[in-house]
Amino acid sequence: MRLRHVVSSLDLTRDDYFRIFELADKFSNVKKLNYLSGKVVSLAFFEPSTRTAQSFHTAAIKLGADVIGFASEESTSIAKGENLADTIRMLNNYSNCIVMRHKFDGAALFASEISDIPIINAGDGKHEHPTQALIDLYTIYKVFGEIDGRTFGLLGDLKYARTVNSLLRALTRFKPKKVFLISPSQLKVRREILDGLNYPVIETENPYDVIQDIDVLYVTRIQKERFVDEVEYEKVKESYVVDLKLVNMMKKDGIILHPLPRVTEIDRKVDKTTNAKYFYQASLAVPLRMALFYEVLGERKDD
């Protein structure tokens, strides 16, 4: 069954995740295919992006699709006063799928409710980033061969990081042993996210108390652009630094992930450790997003 919109991690079933992982494996060494020949993908990035925009662009091209779009709100008619609904309707006329990033929470859901073509959420405000969660889980699957039964530690900005929200929600499709939420009190996971989880969660402010139990340490930067009050940002901006001291306390086969960009929250000396998998994680973005495009737009025998 073809996927329609991918607005939230909860739009995917457990079977969907594994099917996309299997497809990503098949696409991992592909140079160029024509599966999406004749299709047009719109990259509607109302908010800046480097990795996400470029990896989606590359994924579409490698499947044979044509790509149109924009990289900032300033380059669109929204800068002239056009509303989001009209922009989405216009993009429906030009393309077969819209990959959308926006600064407002819920923008992707709003777009999906008025769009006749699939919407893929590439990040909406501090709400969600479901394709990043797909990459995160795919990395874990590739490293360990499984996701169930693992202990996770999410560290850093757990309040404003949309990648955290999507990963926590995606994990409801699996069976994590437990999840440690490690953050300053000002940056704890929001209650509406916690209330929807179906696995054990433990909140703490000290990573040293739990690091020895963690299989997957997921690190996020403190997101200055989400803070209304810069004074509050200054208080927490360097709350944690993952350094060699912390890494040396991890399990030997434990891994460190990061959605990137990294600022100061992971010491660069950590990059050379066997635990550091964040650059490998980033390398999986293109085949994973190829798989997602194929799920949304590819021809199916059951269509």
Curated annotation (Swiss-Prot):
Keyword Coiled coil set for record: no
Organism: Saccharolobus islandicus (strain M.16.4 / Kamchatka #3) (Sulfolobus islandicus)
HAMAP family with a match to the protein in the record: Asp_carb_tr (MF_00001)
InterPro entries assigned: Asp/Orn_carbamoyltranf_P-bd (IPR006132), Asp/Orn_carbamoylTrfase (IPR006130), Asp/Orn_carbamoylTrfase_sf (IPR036901), Asp_carbamoyltransf (IPR002082), Asp_carbamoyltransf_Asp/Orn-bd (IPR006131)
This protein's record includes keyword Signal: no
GO BP annotations listed: 'de novo' pyrimidine nucleobase biosynthetic process; 'de novo' UMP biosynthetic process; amino acid metabolic process
Transmembrane segments annotated in the record for this chain: none
NCBIfam families, A to Z: asp_carb_tr, PRK00856.1
Subunit and interaction comment: Heterooligomer of catalytic and regulatory chains.
Binding site for L-aspartate: 80, 162, 221
Catalytic activity: carbamoyl phosphate + L-aspartate = N-carbamoyl-L-aspartate + phosphate + H(+)
GO molecular function, one term: aspartate carbamoyltransferase activity
Binding residue positions for carbamoyl phosphate: 51-52, 101, 129, 132, 260-261
Signal peptide range: none
Pathway in which this enzyme or protein is active: Pyrimidine metabolism; UMP biosynthesis via de novo pathway; (S)-dihydroorotate from bicarbonate: step 2/3
Family: Belongs to the aspartate/ornithine carbamoyltransferase superfamily. ATCase family.
Protein's UniProt name: Aspartate carbamoyltransferase catalytic subunit
Keywords: Pyrimidine biosynthesis, Transferase
The EC number(s) this enzyme carries: 2.1.3.2
Role: Catalyzes the condensation of carbamoyl phosphate and aspartate to form carbamoyl aspartate and inorganic phosphate, the committed step in the de novo pyrimidine nucleotide biosynthesis pathway.
